[in-house]
Amino acid sequence: FYGDNIFRLFRDDSGGIIRDPKAEPEAKILVDQPRKPVSRLDVGTEGDTVTITTGKIRVEIDKKTSLIKIVDLKTEAVAVEQAAPVLFEKGKTTLSLKTGPEEYFYGGGVQNGRFSHKGKVISIENQNSWTDGGVASPTPFYWSTNGYGLLWHTFKKGQYDFGAKEKGTVNLSHDENYLDVFFMVDDGAVNLLRKFYQLTGNPVLLPKFAFYQGHLNAYNRDYWKEDEKGILFEDGKRYKESQKDNGGIRESLNGELDNYQFSARAVIDRYKAHDMPLGWLLPNDGYGAGYGQTDTLDGNIANLKSLADYALKNGVEIGLWTQSDLHPKPEISALLQRDIVKEVRDAGVRVLKTDVAWVGAGYSFGLNGITDVAQIMTYYGNNSRPFIISLDGWAGTQRYAGIWTGDQTGGAWEYIRFHIPTYIGSGLSGQPNICSDMDGIFGGKNPAVNIRDFQWKTFTPMELNMDGWGANEKYPHVFGEPATSINRWYLKLKSELMPYAYSIAEESVSGMPMVRAMFLEYPNPYTLGKATQYQFLFGPYFLVAPVYQDTNADKEGNDVRHGIYLPEGQWIDYFTGDLYEGGKIYNCFDAPVWKLPVFVKNGAIIPMTGPNNNVSEINPNHRIYEIYPHGRTSFTTYDDDGVTEEYRQGRGVKTRIESALDGSNNVTVTVHPSVGDFNGFDKKKSTEFRINVTRKPDKVS
């Protein structure tokens, strides 16, 4: 037992003792101290049944069949029960469990295009498959609405059948010769996710700059030659890019070779010139790029530091993409040589993005690599908080990194469509930090899709602008008007919502994800399945229904959205203020090209800040609360230094805000004293209240 309601079942008929799963390279699924005290442990016999009882569950083992049943003592209901003996075959073990007709299942990691698995089969397998139906980052963990979760303690691939082939039975298998699983029993998603985190680690809280758009490309490899069909640059000429020397101008990070407009520095300038938010930059995201053109690794590190210094002056952090091993190897050329310690300590790297070139083998390999990087970034980066974006992960990845969904083609509605349930499912699998490329890495040339992708991802954790591979440049201003202004507006809105987003991000470290399935707040037969897979909640107060298809669009992209389910309560169109009654499904919702269908729940309290382009522009001495008075509601904001690991030691500040509307339409807003502290926290703040009302107030006091 790993606590009163976590039970480990280990069985190896070949005689092996309880152990960690084999991992090459070495990695650990469990944290160093996964156990919690057990309040009591009573073993008894009742007829043909052996019982093991803790303070919260009773494990019943049938003497004749060895089948196991686990009862939740709080309800005296059976949470989970074996349907058949464990089946051991050569290189495969199968566990069969009973399931009821009203039971639903979630988890399995980043299962592209899916989140609710009742009656389906999912692969717990490193597939390197990035489109609908593929698996971008598997996790051998799922949970049931019946009140249990299961973690299979293995690095081997598996398959989970939730009643697809055999109705009434869940068949779970992994390519392993023994059984090692953890049963977690509790009520609700949050409690079961917390049990999963107890065993495998809490998700990281991303640094604040990570919530801003990032730009990724290679700026140390290609040559640019004038071509009338090429890309238009600031000098008024068009250039075509080539990875081979075509007689053109070679790019570099810092633009010191009369090549500034092709440099990484120019990217930062470009975002500033177009007044677009930018939080971070990866200048080597491309095979064979490197980050310097000198004959030595140290010379290239100095080149990288020069870019980092320039970026930091402009409020932007830098990071690196990984192609090769991150530690020096003499046989590798200076161009591709890596030294992650010097990159972090000397050059100031604070972001790392993995790819199939490095972690594509998946399973323990990806977990091993990011474990190393996370420790180095903190130790050599002045206790800096690692920002790692990975894929091909496993159980435990969440304690070090966020996930991106891989390489896909933008410019098509399918790109948006399948990503919505993908994001929802990632959070239900214990990985709240999920992202994808803005309008895809490939394709493009569809302004409507580009705009709609920027819109809905305003209400997600991260945004990756992966440039250099598409049919057009991947800048938010690339399509001109109206796309430029619309994309800027939503990027600015994302920056304004930072206090709200950061607060729900902190909440996701110990439970409820940021991007929430509708049933997490409003469970009913309609929300538990796939009916609401194309909408979600962003925290407790925003309901987002992305435009994910061409329903009846005109040539400008103005359209309507069908099938928006508003749960019980009152919902307000965030952009018009129109009030909608919940408990209904709305069709033909007007969605002109500028407008994302997004609703705020009446009673909401939204902490905000002024529009900004990066974290350094946020005024720490001014706080904004936007309030929609209705009944009695509350919200607790969270803040910390946003850059270090000190939040893990409790260095943060929480502030509770309450709103109360009485029967006489009197509104009382209470901001309680802040609790906590962190380095740089200023207790003296001005406060701005934005209280949404239906008419001018009679009096304010």
Spans of model-derived segments:
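Beta-sheet entry/capping signal
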Residues: 6-7, 49-51, 58, 67, ...
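Short, glycine-/Ser/Thr-/acidic-enriched flexible segments
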Residues: 14, 66, 146-148, 155-157, ...
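Aromatic- and carboxylate-enriched substrate-binding clefts and catalytic-loop regions
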Residues: 23-32, 277-487, 518-523, 527-532, ...
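An acidic-aromatic substrate-binding cleft motif
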Residues: 195-258, 278, 285
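Active-site mouth loops of central-metabolism enzymes
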Residues: 250-260, 326-335
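Catalytic domains of carbohydrate-active enzymes, especially glycoside hydrolases
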Residues: 263-284
